[in-house]
Every structure is written in structure tokens, then in C-alpha cells.
Amino acid sequence: MGKIIDVVRDRRKLKRKSVKIIFLYKMGQLFNGRGFAKDINLEGMCIVCPALFKTSRGIQLKDYIGSSLQVMIPTANVTVHGTVVWVDLKKGEGGVKITSTTDDARWQQICEET
């Protein structure tokens, strides 16, 4: 059992910081709404968006993967652009790989705050 936990830890290059940051999202022209970030680091984030990631939408899991996503964090005055890399439709969660931000210094500060 110890081997499985070590393998999961090795997948991430950087340690994630547990947070609960409320944000607005936009995916393409059709989907927008609210969600919250569960954990973050400089390269990615785990987001919870049950309204976006749900099975009743008629969208298959493979359709989410690779989609561009814009995450706006009004409290921090920063927007994060990323790509969806994994989705869990049962939990309404997804993983986003960050491609760019509107303020890299501010994003780094958010990731480092305790």
C-alpha cells in the first residue's frame, strides 16, 4: 500500500497548497459560472465546479480534456488561463494545467501565502 501512495506523490512536480478560493470561470462561448479552487500551485489547480463538471450535461468526459478554461479570481485581481487535464464527473472536480496568468507575480504570491 505504501508504494501506491509514493507513486501518486511522484506525479506532481510541485507541492499543492490547500485553499478555498471562489472564482468565476469561462469555458468557450457557452459555459460560465462559479466554482472554487481546492488546491493550487504555480503550474496547476484542482477546481470544484459541479455546474460545469456533471454527468447530466450530455458532454462526455473526453470532451472536457484539452479544453481551454479561463479562471477569474476577483478577490486577487488575477485571471488564470489553463487547459483541463482531468475531470471527475461524480465529484464535480477537474484539474487545470496553467498556461498563463494576467499577473504572474500576484499568482506566485497567492501560491506562497500561508
Cite the ranges covered by each PLM segment.
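Short, conserved charged micro-motifs
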Residues: 54-59, 105-106
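N-terminal helix initiation/capping motif
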Residues: 1-53, 111-114
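A residue-level detector for short acidic-glycine micro-motifs
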Residues: 39, 86-88, 100
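Short conserved beta-strand and strand-loop elements enriched in small hydrophobics
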Residues: 19-27, 61-77
